[in-house]
Amino acid sequence: SRARYYVSFSYLRQEGMWNSKWTEYNDKFSTQHVLNRYNLRSNLDIDVNKYLNVSLDLGGRIDNISQPRTGVFSLVTFGAVEADPMAPVYTPNGELYSKSTAQNPARLLGSSGQDKNRRRNLYSTVNVTGDLSELVKGLKANVTVSFDAFDVFQSTQDNSVNSYEYDYMNMNVKDPSQFEYKQTTKYSALTNPSANERANYYNFNFNAGFSYNRSFGKHAVDARAFIRIRIWKTYATLTTMM
């Protein structure tokens, strides 16, 4: 056959382990860890004629990651491992309980905002091979061009929820309505996104030359002559090697 091809697409979704009761505490946004990954890979190989072959390799990946701004260490350490086992989740009047010395994991998740990251990878290679045996037996010409790119774009948003503390160890209180509350944190809506380009680079490679492979009786000759150009750019830093 003169043309051969291969195409592959895959999708992966992963979600975190946090209780959805608290990650979905706010309307219209979630503080759960979520990864959506898209992969594409394709190969195309064409025999243009008996002297010329062209191939293309193309691949790409996109990761969309959403996570709470409160880190896993804080959620696990202060929300679980070092949490006060006597501290309540709610106050008697139904509000979230929290105190500077007793972090409530429910409040930590509900007021952690959002940290979103988009990662993109692109891989591409074009290879052209010409058979010059009609001119010189065993001689071939080859050109290879590749381009790879990678970037990470981040957006962050903050929010807060209402939470209160009270002296739940006060033995003089006979009825829950007698407790006095002090507001610990105050509600604030999700802020506008704050953008940050965390990484951005590309890599360009060019390789061109000739190869010679021929046998003469008991002897063989295998030789190559080529030129290579590489350009690597990260933001404004440019490196060229030849």
Regions inferred by a protein language model and the residue ranges of each:
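Membrane-embedded beta-strand positions of outer-membrane beta-barrel proteins
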Residues: 7, 56, 126, 141-143, ...
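Outer-membrane beta-barrel translocator domains and adjoining extracellular loop/strand segments
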Residues: 18-24, 67-73, 154-160, 234-241
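Charge-patterned, long linear interaction tracts outside catalytic cores
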Residues: 125-146, 159
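Flexible loop and strand-edge segments within Gram-negative outer membrane beta-barrel domains
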Residues: 2-10, 14-17, 31-103, 113-121, ...
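Residues on the lipid-exposed face of transmembrane beta-strands in outer-membrane beta-barrel proteins
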Residues: 1, 42-46, 124-130, 208-212, ...
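Outer-membrane beta-barrel transmembrane domain signature of Gram-negative proteins
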Residues: 1, 83-99, 159, 163-242
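Extracellular loop and loop/strand-boundary signature of outer-membrane beta-barrel proteins
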Residues: 24-30, 43, 109-115, 127, ...
